[in-house]
Amino acid sequence: MKVVATNRKAYHDYDIYDKYEAGIELKGSEVKALRQGRVNLKDSYVRIKDGEVWWLQGHISNLETTYSAFKHDEKRPRKLLLHKNEIAKLAGYTSEKGYTLVPLRIYFNNRNRAKLEIAVAKGRKLHDKRRVMKEKELKKEAASAMKRYGF
């Protein structure tokens, strides 16, 4: 499995509850750009509309070598491929207040198919972000102290 890009900001801004693997409906030039790592997940999000799951604002850059007739819109909505029962589960989660769908990472699986890992998440407040950062820092200090004293 070759990870192309991760959305590190999602782990900071959201509490992650459930993860799903979704296929992506792409054009040829988009696949080639993905293989070169020309993708940005930072400001993208996932929505369910009319029983279909869509990845919105995902930025896949055009290649300089692509002929102008084959160039794609860099931020076009891309359909995600999931089973009906998974879509129903996700719709149930997102109907609850505060829950949303966020893309976590994009990668090529062992069969060389582009996949997007999406998660059901709930936004964190500022004080929650600070608390989580403090806990991580304490954990890191404890681990280094244990290592230093040979435990």
Swiss-Prot record:
Its main location: cytoplasm. GO terms for biological process: trans-translation. Keywords: Cytoplasm, RNA-binding. InterPro entries: SmpB, SsrA-bd_prot, SsrA-bd_prot_CS. One of its GO terms (cellular component) is cytosol. PROSITE patterns: SSRP. It is found in: Cytoplasm. GO terms for molecular function: RNA binding. Required for rescue of stalled ribosomes mediated by trans-translation. Binds to transfer-messenger RNA (tmRNA), required for stable association of tmRNA with ribosomes. tmRNA and SmpB together mimic tRNA shape, replacing the anticodon stem-loop with SmpB. tmRNA is encoded by the ssrA gene; the 2 termini fold to resemble tRNA(Ala) and it encodes a 'tag peptide', a short internal open reading frame. During trans-translation Ala-aminoacylated tmRNA acts like a tRNA, entering the A-site of stalled ribosomes, displacing the stalled mRNA. Belongs to the SmpB family. This is SsrA-binding protein. The gene is smpB.
